[in-house]
């Protein structure tokens, strides 16, 4: 399966590439300012991962456009950290500042669907971020699929059910975002989560969507 990793100039990008490769994917890395979305759409990718990055969605090159265009073309798309924030913003959500969290282990509760299928809940994950998606601004098209446990936050700081939003999912398009890092050693089930994501790409390829 051919997977695009859209690189937002992040040190974690090649950890993602390594994990995806170990899962059998043929991975192509393209930096966020080295191609247009139209150029990438015709390359026959079966799935897309939009990487973490050190900036904001507004500074993430083609990421904002990509997280809409690929799902709208039927290509499963996963945003990680900055990619997750870009997904929320691209569909009308708001990204706000949050107290910096770097290399923090925490537990999240999830809904057990799609990328979280067969994964334990609570799930231990590693967080590295200073921006979050603000719950009250999410459009109806997006649903919250995971939040932190025992980490209260106000709605203004991205609070959701007493915690910070850690994953979102589009209700009708194959697009998901995760605030945490599946490629971090602090996320023991990260490989399993990415395997679930690639399974969606495989189904899309078999169905002739991608």
Could you describe each region identified by the protein language model?
Residues 17-26:
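Two-component/phosphorelay signaling modules centered on CheY-like receiver
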